[in-house]
Regions:
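Conserved acetyl-CoA pyrophosphate-binding loop and the N-cap/start of the following alpha-helix
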Residues: 102-114
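Conserved GNAT acetyl-CoA-binding A-motif
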Residues: 119-133
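Active-site rim helix/loop that mediates acceptor-substrate recognition in acyltransferases
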Residues: 28-57, 65-71
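Glycine-rich phosphate/pyrophosphate-binding loop shared by adenosine-nucleotide-utilizing enzymes
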Residues: 3-5, 58-63, 91
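A short beta-loop-alpha structural element at the N-terminal edge
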Residues: 4-20
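Conserved acyl-donor/pantetheine-binding loop and adjacent beta-alpha core of acyl/acetyltransferases
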Residues: 64-95, 156-176
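Conserved beta-strand-loop-alpha-helix junction that forms the acyl-donor binding cleft
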Residues: 103, 129-141, 157-162
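Conserved acetyl-CoA-binding loop of GNAT-fold acetyltransferases
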Residues: 143-153
Length: 184
């Protein structure tokens, strides 16, 4: 069975559906309106939008949030000393989410490809991400590796502080001990 997918730039009109899908996939408290507005703004630079959504008919089936280089905060989970390019040239691949029923068809890779092209137009020469190693079948790391990503460093308990502040991990609930793979 062949389906027609409609890829387009993320806009504020998509926020409610993005939050709904993010909650289903990543857990309660992962994303709200305030965070969504902030994440969206960080993806805009020089009139170029690095965020994308994909619809099947009227159903949102995936989205990619990417922060433009120099429009995101380096934190303790960023091993900048290990990065092969200057920090100011690095975009941040914040979130790539695909509805469970639509996984395995290249949607995540296509969303990443589109964000990479936009980030390059914005001036980035590389992108970094923290991938959820406990994703089903470690699919997050597998897809990013397939798309050319390399491991920079593993970070145990990456989302622990957030879980204590209200984020509900789909695996650990409110005491998350999942590990992130920092990849570029």
């Amino acid at each position: 069975m062949s389906i027609t997918l409609n890829y387009q730039h993320l806009t504020p009109a998509d926020f409610d559906l993005i939050i709904q899908l993010a909650t289903e996939v990543h857990g309660t408290g992962y994303l709200d309106q305030k965070s969504m507005q902030d994440w969206y703004a960080k993806g805009l630079k020089n009139g170029i939008n690095a965020g994308f959504v994909v619809y099947h008919d009227q159903k949102l089936v995936g989205f990619r949030i990417t922060y433009a280089a120099q429009q995101w905060q380096i934190d303790k989970w960023c091993s900048t000393e290990l990065w092969p390019v200057p920090v100011e040239q690095v975009c941040y691949f914040k979130c790539n989410t695909v509805d469970e029923s639509y996984r395995g068809h290249g949607i995540g890779g296509e969303l990443l490809k589109r964000s990479v092209a936009a980030a390059k137009q914005q001036g980035a020469t590389a992108g970094v991400s923290h991938l959820w190693k406990q994703s089903p079948g470690n699919s997050a790391v597998k897809y990013f590796t397939k798309c050319g990503g390399i491991l920079i460093k593993d970070h145990p308990d990456r989302w622990h502080e957030l879980s204590l502040a209200g984020y509900e991990c789909p695996i650990c609930n409110n005491n998350c001990h999942c590990e992130a793979a920092e990849m570029m």
